[in-house]
Amino acid sequence: MIEIPSEYRGWWRIAETSLWGESGLDVIGTALLSITGSDDRLRMHCLLAYVNWKVNTASLSFNWNGSWEFDEMSGTGNVKLRRDGRLDGRLAIKNGDKSTFVAEPAEPPEHSIPHPPSWRDKWGSRRW
């Protein structure tokens, strides 16, 4: 488990993104990012992902691995604490889109964020 600075530790509600806007942000549940250093997750739009953190001097960076709907994806990102207590973040999809986001402190979700589905979850039951 990585030691996350206390000012970052917890759950964050992703309130807006520069590329995808706010429409559909919560389509599969409240858009959230967990920063605990153990079993962290990201959920927004149709993205479910596992997150691995790295502590930097004035920010946190992360790698993520998951799926957008049933398409496996991965990427990188970073967050920096603002003076108003919110996070400024960046999210990049490997070989794809990049977006900034703003996140606000939040309570943990009532139900845990599900594991990202794989293409097998979509196509595994089909017989060709």
Feature-to-residue mapping (PLM):
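Edge beta-strand at a domain terminus
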Residues: 1-8, 17, 52-54, 84-86, ...
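N-terminal glycine/threonine-rich, aromatic-flanked beta-hairpin/loop signature
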Residues: 2-4, 11-14, 22-59
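Short beta-strand segments that buttress and anchor functional surface loops
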Residues: 41-46, 61-68, 89-92
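Short, cysteine-centered beta-strand-loop-beta hairpins and adjacent loop/turn segments enriched
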Residues: 20-23, 69-71
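Short, surface-exposed coil-to-beta transition loops
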Residues: 27-30, 47-50, 72-76, 96-100
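Generic short beta-strand segments
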Residues: 13-19, 63-67
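Mid-chain, well-packed structural core segment of small domains
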Residues: 53-85
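Beta-strand elements of well-folded, non-transmembrane domains
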Residues: 16, 37, 68, 81-83, ...
